[in-house]
Amino acid sequence: MDAFRGYLAAQKGQHNQAASNNPPFHSDHEMHHYGAHPNTNAAPADDYYTPYLGLRARLSQTWINRWTILLLLIIVRLLISLSTINGDIASAKTEALSACTSVENVGSAMASMPHYLSQGVNSMAAAGITKAVNGMMEMLYLTLTGVEEIVLFVIHMMTSTYMCLITLAITGSLQVAIQMIEDVGAFMNKSIDTITGDMSSGLKSFEDDLNGFLSKINIGGIFGSSTSPPKIDLSSEINKLNSIQIDPSTMDADLAKLNASLPTFDQVQNFTDSIIKLPFEEVKKLVNESKIGYKFDDSVFPVPQKKSLTFCSDNTAIQDFFIGLVKTLNIAKKIMLIVLIIAAILACVPMAYREIWGWRSMQRRAALLKAHNYTNELDILYQAHRPYTSQFGLKLSRRFKGQKNQILARWFIAYATSIPALFVLALGMAGLFTCLCQFIILRTIEKEIPALAAEVGDFAEHVVQALNNASEAWALGANSVINNTNTDINENVFGWVNTTTGAINETLNVFTDEMTKALNVTFGGTILYKPIMGVFECLVGLKVAGIEKGLTWVSDHAHVEFPEFQPDVFSLGAAASLTNSTADDNFLANPATSTTDEITDAVVKVGKKLEAVIKQEALISASLVIVYFVIVFIGFVRVVIGMCGRDKSRAEGGSGPGTLYRNGFPHQHLPVIREEKFGSNASDGWHEEHMRAGGDTIRMPFGGDGAADDLPYDGAPAPKYEASIAPVTTEMGSERLGVVPGGRANTNRGPWVRDEKGREGWEADDAQMRATSSYGFLENGDEKSSGWGLPPRRV
């Protein structure tokens, strides 16, 4: 109001006492509208009927103020959006349950896979076991034949080798021994004859000489005896020695007998062959019989039962999820509605206060306008219709210098806050606020999706668990069948091998015993027994021991063990798919979509649909806000151009400004100075004041001659008034800005300048300019040429 009062006071300064010389056609007792109060300075009383709305009528409509209506529109939009979301959630629930049923069917089919796969796996396993056993028996048959021949070959080789060695060694030795004995016998016989002949002749000569010697000496006479000495006669002993003859045939008779009795081991070899071949032939016979009739029966394998999963039917997780989601949305809806309704109700309070304040402000403005006879009808209407923006424009205009800039600043505020512009802005902001509320709802939905995804993950776990249980049960039964097959083969097939190896070892022992017995019979008690037994142990004993050791190893390791089925043979792939993040590997995923599965996708679709609606509405609302800022920018460009450009004068095609001095229009109230009369009396002429403007001075009539310096205005500092420099309309016609070269201008017809150049400068500078100044004064009966008053400013 202070700005408005200052503005009116500036208009009032354009009038002086001359106004009293041009009274209006009507007096102070002018005709009023119906219901008008006779006091022109007071607002109509409340007990009068008026064609305009009073305070109570205005207050009765505060509940339909723009902000409440805007919030109600937002509430309606949210209700429409939430109803759409509820329908989408219901559709998503139906789709999710349908998808869950599909997943349940898929899960049941997956869990029943062991039932379908086991038949083929059982047949394949049975065929594999059959072929493996037949192949093993064929190999066993060939192996037995090979081992049999190898054992016989080794035994034959050893016996033949040993026989050849014995024959070579013993026969050769015996032949040498017999020949040597015969040669020794012949040599001894010949030697004895020669020795005995030589001994006989030698002993004969010795006997003769000894007897002749003894006869010549008288031994008896020496010892006193008459006995004659004995005579030595060795011929009989020599004859006996000469009669000794060695017979070689008697000496090598035993060797010849031994040579004739050397064994050929044919009996041992034949006995060994018959003993060794017997178990081999028996085993081969059994293997051949089993091989022809063996076929593994696949019916002994278990077949799992079909599985029917009911994790959707028995589990209310999806139902609970959507019920909880609807409850969450309802809570959010209630909170938003309560907040918006409270805001809409509370908006009535400041709007009621605004109506009260506006009503009082309008009363004050009406009184001021009526008291000061303000004549700018459009400005009056604008300030009355838009009190807030007009007052803000007045305050903003004070920051600018010059009348034109101040007017343009006020125009910019009026342009930016016009009803159409604010309507566009309000629609845009309301739309953005609605998008914000819907965005909160969208985030609420997205926040609940992980819970549903977790439930879907549990569904997959149920499927894998059922599949794993079926797989484990089938693997347990199948492995039991395989273990029984292993036991049967090891006992019925490789039992023969164990029997055969034991029999072969026993046969080899018998072979060794028979060989030893034959050698004992042949060489027992002879000097060749130990060498022969050493050679036998070296050539045969060690080899037989090695064969027995190998056969023992074969007996210890001759068993079959078919591989067993793993417990996760049917569930391994499904379990692995749960740990893989790619959609193509997840057996519950739909490869055609990028979402994890159809169940969560049903909820995601709701969020995407709402997100698309929010984006569309946000773009529309943002476009409205942008349109508003475009309007503001257009006004700003217009103001900048107006401030920077030069106004055209009337001579250049421009239009002159409206004047405040409408003396030619008697029905207009002029801004007359009513109580403050300057000069010596109330009817003195106008006094002249120098003013600074446009580099030159301008004079305007203020008061009368003899006006004192700084005359008071109701005891307050002198207000500033406004005067037009456009042509002045008076009773004598219309004049342009007057030119007074010097001296006093005894005229009451508007402002004037010193020379023509000054007038042109003023008109060229700004045709719409209005100069303001405080009261001037006279010095020594004449005005000063410069420096009077304050420099003018533009308003």
From Swiss-Prot:
Residues 88-149, 352-421, 638-795 are cytoplasmic. The chain crosses the membrane at residues 67-87, 150-170, 331-351, 422-442, 617-637. It is a multi-pass membrane protein. It is found in: Cell membrane. The keyword Coiled coil does not apply. Keywords: Cell membrane, Conjugation, Glycoprotein, Membrane, Transmembrane, Transmembrane helix. Residues 13-24 have a biased composition (Polar residues). Residues 752-762 have a biased composition (Basic and acidic residues). The keyword Transmembrane helix applies. Involved in cell fusion during mating by stabilizing the plasma membrane fusion event. This is Plasma membrane fusion protein prm1. It comes from Sclerotinia sclerotiorum (strain ATCC 18683 / 1980 / Ss-1) (White mold).
